[in-house]
Amino acid sequence: MSECTHDCSSCGESCADRQGGSPFQIKPLHEGCHVRKVYGVVSGKGGVGKSMVTSQLAVTMQRRGHRTAILDADVTGPSIPKCFGIHGRAVGSEDAILPVQTETGIQLMSVNLLLEHETDPVIWRGPVIGGVVQQFWGDVLWQDVDYMFVDMPPGTGDVPLTVFQSLPLDGIIIVTSPQELVSMIVSKAVAM
């Protein structure tokens, strides 16, 4: 870890030495929860393998001895539970939701884990979807996570904006393919 240079424009939102107020409102985790590092996984276009990359990153870090989690922010097109063969439902109380765990202990939260049938469509507008993503961050009992990967929907719409403004991201991972159209859209996502 490097020494603080007090150039706060170059540090992450979770930096303990950060000076000045953030223009965004970072939502706190549920009481007693701790997540050390948060990485958003984004793409400019659907179908480039973003959810598979997200899953592989979590598995790789888990195999290296870290506790990992995936927050599936692709609310209208969730696929993370399917990547792990999870078909059960998340349980909770009035106070919190428990993440579902894979066979190897990766913690997952996805809208598909809350639906009665995983094939039920989610037909919600932007503000509702953004609220769900914030609830997945703040109302789920994440259990001592070293690395959380946030699988986002493609593009630069409401969900990526909500994640960038309300979760303490330490970085983003951009998944792309070589097509010219995809490169243009990825450039827009990077500029966010």
Spell out what each predicted region is.
Residues 32, 77, 126-134, 157, ...:
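Amphipathic alpha-helical transducer elements in NTP-driven molecular machines
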Residues 67-68, 73-118, 130:
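Phosphate-binding loop that captures ATP/GTP phosphates
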Residues 35, 46, 72, 80, ...:
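Residue-level signature of catalytic and energy-coupling elements of molecular machines
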Residues 146-192:
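Conserved catalytic-core segment of NTP-binding enzymes
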Residues 30-36:
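Phosphate-binding P-loop
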Residues 1-28:
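Cysteine-cluster motifs in flexible loop/terminal segments that predominantly coordinate metals
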Residues 37-75, 190:
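Walker A/P-loop phosphate-binding motif and the immediately C-terminal alpha-helix
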